[in-house]
Design a protein with these regions (language model features):
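Extracellular Ig-like/FN3 beta-sandwich strand-entry sites
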Residues: 38, 81-83, 156-158, 196-200
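Beta-strand-rich binding/interaction modules
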Residues: 54-56, 145-175, 181-183
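N-terminal carbohydrate-binding accessory modules
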Residues: 136-137, 204-235
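A structural microfeature
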Residues: 62, 171, 211-213
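Exposed aromatic-hydrophobic patches
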Residues: 70-77, 180-189
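Accessory beta-strand-rich segments of carbohydrate-active enzymes
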Residues: 15, 19-132
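Short, aromatic- and glycine-rich surface loops/edge beta-strands on solvent-exposed regions
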Residues: 85-88, 197-208
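Surface beta-strand/loop "capping" patches
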Residues: 127-156, 233
């Protein structure tokens, strides 16, 4: 469970974190029996506002800057057994720094918006294989009846890629040594995405070693160009 940020009344603190102050979190964690079955242990944070450093069992696990993006830390080597201590230190410059902050200000003028600091998204643990999918980028190319897949992993080569429509496989392929693959969608299976008909294809990626990720995409391209009158705009 993620606690309320210290600026909120429900936190019981009711204090606006100042740029020269630290916000600390500390708790003991016990993993469910049989949770770690080998491979790697990842500690995920949905978002922490704004800059943070993480310790596991007193050892620094990593740090992150930016209050709006998720991040993950590999804590496998820092945990022995099923129990560990997690500590987090947060700083938040709000409008005294150069980081993205939205409407947040230490001194609000003309708007009733309280700054928020610390953990504000879900925190969770994940057990993954040694060779796991770190990131996946899907780039539709409707003008070529194709889709480009790019993934990141320790060993991204020879990953199986499957594209399905309405539960049936319509394209299959494998990634090269760089983790890339371009698959052609048969013309009779091509269906463009639109706001009126937001059709999505299903895609599954299976790495050598067993890690599997399922996602989806729509066939649509966006860009900047000239219309029939010669005016530049989104197309």
């Amino acid at each position: 469970m993620v606690p309320f940020s210290p600026e909120t009344p429900l936190s019981g603190v009711g204090h606006i974190l100042q740029p020269d102050e630290y916000l600390w979190y500390r708790r003991s964690v016990t993993l469910p029996e049989g949770f770690f079955r080998g491979g790697r242990l990842l500690l995920h944070f949905g978002a922490v506002d704004q800059c943070c450093t993480v310790w596991v069992n007193g050892q620094e696990a990593g740090s992150h800057t930016g209050g709006y993006l998720p991040f993950a830390l590999d804590v496998t080597e820092l945990i022995e057994g099923d129990a560990f201590t997690l500590e987090l230190r947060v700083t938040d410059p709000t409008d005294t720094g150069s980081l993205s902050r939205g409407k947040q200000r230490l001194k609000n003028t003309g708007i009733w918006y309280t700054p928020q600091s610390g953990i504000w998204q879900t925190v969770w643990m994940e057990c993954v294989p040694e060779n796991y999918l770190r990131s996946l980028r899907i780039t539709p190319k409707p003008e070529e009846n194709a889709v480009h897949i790019r993934l990141e992993a320790d060993d991204p080569a020879m990953a199986a890629v499957t594209i399905c429509r309405d539960g049936g496989i319509i394209a299959e392929g494998q990634t090269d040594e760089n983790g890339e693959s371009t698959l052609t969608i048969p013309a009779e299976e091509l269906r463009l995405w639109s706001p009126e008909e937001p059709f999505l294809y299903d895609v599954a990626i299976t790495l050598a070693g067993g890690d599997k990720v399922e996602s989806y995409f729509g066939m649509r391209a966006f860009g900047i160009g000239k219309d029939e009158k010669g005016c530049r705009g989104c197309c």
